[in-house]
């Protein structure tokens, strides 16, 4: 057998073996073993994201200047919006390219790949221009108080300069998966995150650069991710190309690609607007309130992020058994994932509440600000155990292929419900109401999501029994 043919045969046999092994895991292994096998890698990936999101604020907090902590919190939402656009483009590009390859439409795949590359760079350049030319206007909209303007402007301008790198790395880490190249996207983002975490203490503490150092570390992390993805595209990809001629062949595909990725980014867009509105309300009470709320949020985010990671990991398990109409196993999966996520939520929430002063102290050094953060933290964790049901319901709807209800659920908690809750609760209860709005929004989102989940499950039972 020729060597090339032998390699192809071996690769096919390996893929077939992996597929059979995965099917056995989905179908035959104990539910607990299947859940943990699938959830652990997902949770580890989520934890890296949590550490990445905490790093800047943690090391800035070590300076003992809570104003700089608040500055980071104020600027965050506008870059979340930019990331949401990148997520839409990346997820849409991955789906459209993969579908085109499956249909043997390689020219379409190349056009979409080139559009994703150049659109991410172009969007990043436009974002950079807007952020640099309208810094004060944007910061005013974001809720920056007078004492935050200097730090926030510096932080935003440095990050803005690296926006093309950020958007490119987010978009292409998703798009390369369309060719089956899972590792390059994951490893590039991981390398960028590790670079950021290593450089943060060097620039922030060692060189005493504060928020400027934090921003530079972030940009350099994105640069590392971009370089690794660029090397892969140029050396290993058979479809993706930096040649603009492919993008110019069918530019109309860009709108279709963005539309396909809309469900993946819309929740992040709404979350960014909700965070901006929250900071606008918090600014009424000064930068100390913004810093306190940011510290409370960072201290508790690990709870919901791990719950989300568990449910994301279990999603293919639910999808396989939903497709097989294995109702007893579906029921067992739902029950055990609920037990795991809610049980973890209860334990972690209790731990966070008992250790709230120490957690807040990681980010805030001023005693008065830390006390505000501890008080606000209660409202952010009180409903967190229930969010296990929320993420389980959302992932079950996705696994069932109900894109509409899955999208509705994804925009509820941090967007469609939270924004009106912030307005109403602040009107009645002031600063405390801003934090309590998250509790009300979470509970309402859980009730709606679980209702949709039960409806979908009963539909499966009903349609299966009639066959």
Label for each model-derived stretch:
Residues 28, 32-51, 55, 78-85, ...:
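Residue-level signal for short hydrophobic patches within transmembrane helices
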């Amino acid at each position: 057998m020729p060597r090339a043919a032998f390699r192809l045969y071996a690769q096919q046999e390996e893929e077939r073996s992996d597929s059979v092994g995965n099917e056995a895991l989905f179908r035959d292994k104990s539910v607990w073993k299947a859940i943990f096998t699938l959830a652990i890698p997902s949770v580890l990936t989520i934890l890296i994201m949590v550490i990445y999101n905490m790093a800047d604020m943690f090391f800035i907090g070590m300076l003992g200047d809570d104003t700089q902590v608040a500055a980071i919190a104020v600027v965050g939402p506008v870059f979340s919006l930019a990331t949401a656009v990148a997520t839409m483009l990346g997820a849409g590009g991955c789906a459209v390219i993969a579908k085109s390859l499956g249909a043997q439409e390689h020219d379409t795949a190349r056009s979409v790949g080139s559009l994703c590359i150049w659109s991410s760079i172009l969007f990043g350049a436009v974002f950079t221009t807007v952020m640099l030319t309208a810094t004060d206007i944007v910061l005013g909209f974001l809720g920056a108080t007078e004492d935050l303007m200097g730090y926030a402007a510096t932080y935003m301008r440095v990050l803005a300069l690296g926006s093309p790198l950020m958007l490119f790395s987010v978009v292409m880490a998703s798009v390369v998966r369309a060719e089956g190249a899972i590792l390059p996207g994951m490893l590039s983002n991981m390398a960028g995150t590790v670079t950021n975490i290593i450089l943060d203490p060097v620039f922030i503490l060692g060189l005493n650069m504060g928020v400027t150092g934090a921003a530079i570390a972030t940009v350099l992390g994105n640069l590392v991710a971009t370089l690794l993805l660029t090397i892969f595209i140029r050396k290993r990809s058979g479809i993706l190309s930096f040649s603009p001629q492919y993008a110019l062949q069918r530019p109309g595909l860009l709108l279709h690609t963005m539309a396909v990725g809309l469900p993946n980014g819309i929740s992040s867009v709404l979350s960014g607007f909700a965070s901006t509105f929250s900071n606008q309300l918090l600014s009424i009470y000064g930068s100390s309130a913004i810093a306190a709320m940011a510290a409370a949020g960072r201290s508790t985010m690990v709870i919901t992020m791990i719950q989300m990671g568990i449910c994301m990991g279990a999603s293919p398990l639910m999808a396989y058994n939903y497709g097989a109409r294995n109702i007893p196993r579906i029921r067992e999966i739902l029950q055990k994932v609920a037990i795991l996520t809610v049980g973890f939520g209860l334990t972690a929430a209790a731990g966070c509440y008992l250790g709230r002063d120490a957690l807040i102290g990681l980010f805030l050094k001023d005693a008065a600000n830390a006390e505000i953060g501890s008080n606000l933290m209660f409202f952010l964790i009180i409903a967190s155990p229930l969010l296990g049901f929320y993420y389980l319901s959302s992932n079950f709807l996705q696994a069932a292929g109900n894109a509409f209800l899955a999208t509705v659920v994804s925009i509820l908690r941090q967007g469609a419900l939270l924004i009106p809750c912030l307005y109403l609760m602040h009107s009645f209860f002031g600063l405390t109401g801003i934090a309590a709005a998250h509790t009300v929004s979470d509970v309402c989102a859980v009730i709606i999501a679980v209702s949709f989940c039960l409806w979908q499950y009963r539909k499966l039972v009903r349609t299966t029994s009639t066959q």
